[in-house]
Amino acid sequence: MGEHSYLVVATSSATPEQVFDLLADAPRWRDWAGSSIRESGWITGTTGGVGAVRKLGRAPLYTEETITEFERPHRMSYSVAGLPVRDYRCTVELAPLGNGTEIRWSGRFTAPRLLARPLRALLRRTVSGFATAAAAAATPSTRQRT
């Protein structure tokens, strides 16, 4: 067993507040996070915050994520249950970048040596997809209505 980590960086033209609010709204994940998240919501709590547990996924595979840090609009951390790894913790850090936001999404987990490399690649690819999708979904629409 060993500890392994990854880091994903994405940029958004949305403000840190807009990105944070999107990520903090568990029921909305199903609207923007892609095909792996068909269902999303809170198990405990109603608006998030430290101690709240969100359930994300698609039948029959779900994860439960317990919010461990909630510092709007700059930082959110959570621990994850329901995956074949131990001690999985993620942190999303948001920083102003010009007129937008830099999203730094990192994860750490413990896994057997033989599984660590493929699990790290899978988790990194999944989180990269979430970061890219969140960056786009948080951006206000520029389409004008007629």
Model-predicted segments: where are they?
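Hydrophobic ligand-binding cavity/cleft-lining segments
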Residues: M1-I43, T146
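Residue-level preference for beta-strand/loop junctions
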Residues: G2-H4, G48, A59, R86
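Hydrophobic-ligand binding "helix-grip"
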Residues: D31, K55-E102, R108-T110, P140
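Anionic, Ser/Thr-rich low-complexity intrinsically disordered regions
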Residues: S35-W42, T46, S77-V80, I103
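Catalytic cores of transferase enzymes with a strong primary signal for eukaryotic protein kinases
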Residues: E39-S40, G45, R54-L56, F109, ...
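A conserved amphipathic terminal alpha-helix motif
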Residues: R108-T146
